[in-house]
Amino acid sequence: MKKFNLRNLSIAFLTIAFLGFQSCSKDGMSGDGETLSQAELQTILNTDDIAGAVDTALAEIIGGNSDESVTVGKEGECYSAEYTETGFVATFNNCVLNGTDNINGTVTATYEVGSEMTTFTATYQDFYVGNIKVNGTRTFEISSSTEQTSVSFSIISDMSIEMEDGSVISENGTKTFTIAFGDSLEGTMISISGSWNVEADGSVYAVETLEDLQGSAACEHMTTGTMVVSKNGLAVTVDFGNGECDDVATLIYPNGATEEISL
């Protein structure tokens, strides 16, 4: 099996967590009784929390690297794999991720390595993270600048997640993560863009970035950019701020009402 370095892929998945925030919302902000609740926002963002940990572990296997943040047993102890020139099929048996969740199940990985672009597709089949079951595909298109000063990851998802209580969340769409490396952590910038749909509890949420969500790697949250979350005809804009390294964002409802939230 041809091996290539996907360590930067792990960094990209860490940026996903920057989108997670806690809402201090109040009912009635939209003027017609329709709002976007904290629970709904958590549902929209929850798919990346689950799939990201698994993807990071796969990146470690493919790259042949080690990372203290991810603990994966050696082949034969934790997983078995059959390799080809273009990928592998791996079956996991109680592998430990980040010291918490056991992963079990099968993933089929195929990839194509180019001089400037690497395409990697992971297909999950009854893949468990703890008691949460993942099915579907995630395709990663990974590129870097010729000067190696930045790296970009486009993630195309078509997947379903069955929670421990039996509820199902599905997601499809594309997200792009870009990391521009600086001389320091403060000077390294992370950008997120894309559009995707999430279906849960009978509702469909359409998410689209209007202005790329950006922030310094030294900040805990994204600090600029806007995205729109649409549900049942209600479109709420989330504004991440003016560049200050804080934990504040603003919800903007169609009638002009605004609401400040803590990230």
Regions found by a protein language model. Name each.
Residues 25-263:
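Low-complexity, intrinsically disordered segments exposed to solvent
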Residues 19-23:
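C-terminal motif of bacterial Sec signal peptides marking the signal peptidase cleavage site
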Residues 2-11:
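Bacterial N-terminal signal peptides that target proteins for export
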Residues 14-15:
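Hydrophobic alpha-helical targeting segments used for export or membrane insertion
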